[in-house]
UniProtKB/Swiss-Prot annotation:
Keyword Cytoplasm attributed: no
InterPro entries: Ribosomal_uS4, Ribosomal_uS4_bac-type, Ribosomal_uS4_N, S4_RNA-bd, S4_RNA-bd_sf
Name used for this protein in its record: Small ribosomal subunit protein uS4
Species in which this protein is naturally found: Chlamydia pneumoniae (Chlamydophila pneumoniae)
Lineage: Bacteria, Pseudomonadati, Chlamydiota, Chlamydiia, Chlamydiales
Segments forming domain S4 RNA-binding: 93-153
Length: 209
């Protein structure tokens, strides 16, 4: 699966937030946007604003690819209900993101690596597809060997269980967690490192699908 391999600190500086949860906040050293004249920004057009919101969403979920974004939108656009919520749920309930939310990894990129390298089980079966969509009642756990990974132990030890969203549960000693219910839009937005106008993103994609 394709993945973003560019400078992640530059992306964080662009949006003015430590969106990837790195221990070394890139904004402490360079708080201004990237570029020679980073502080000088022209007023954005409506298209520019829509594009920026889309880029923020992609960044918040680990620099997901454009075709994954479009595919997720196509999956929900004709369904009954709140399209914006269903669209956002497609990313919040991705396996890599749930591994990150539950605290098995300190960053979304570390979570992606755990999944891709086959360390993660879903309902007892190995799943190495990062975009795998979890449904309520599905349980995430680690392979027996993977429980000995120091990076996982450190991540779980530093995870504050009081910060867990109400739609997931975590059993640190058992190295497992569960998606309890489908998250609501406001619950998901509360977990994002920066505000995103999801309706604007949906409007942007509706003209391109």
């Amino acid at each position: 699966m394709a993945r973003y391999c560019g400078p992640k600190n530059r992306v964080a500086r662009r949006f003015g937030a430590n969106i990837f949860g790195r221990s070394r906040n890139p904004l402490l050293k360079k708080p201004h946007p990237p570029g020679q004249h980073g502080m000088q920004r022209k007023k954005k057009s409506d298209y520019g604003l829509q594009l920026e919101e889309k880029q923020k969403l992609k960044a918040c979920y680990g620099m997901i690819m454009e075709k994954q974004l479009v595919k997720a939108f196509k999956e929900v656009i004709h369904k009954q209900g709140n399209v914006a919520q269903m669209f956002l749920e497609r990313f919040e309930c991705r396996l890599d993101n749930m591994v990150y939310r539950m605290g098995f990894a300190k960053t979304i990129f570390a979570a992606q690596q755990l999944v891709a390298h086959g360390h993660i089980l879903v309902n007892g079966r190995r799943v190495d597809r990062r975009s795998f969509f979890l449904r309520p009642g599905m349980q995430i756990s680690l392979k027996e060997k993977s429980k000995r990974l120091q990076s996982v132990k450190d991540a779980l030890e530093s995870k504050d269980e009081s910060s867990l969203p109400s739609y997931i549960s975590l059993d640190k000693t058992g190295f497992k967690g569960e998606l309890l219910v489908s998250p609501e839009q406001d619950q998901i937005e509360a977990q994002l490192p920066l505000p995103i106008n999801i309706s604007v993103v949906c409007e942007f994609l509706s003209h391109r699908t």
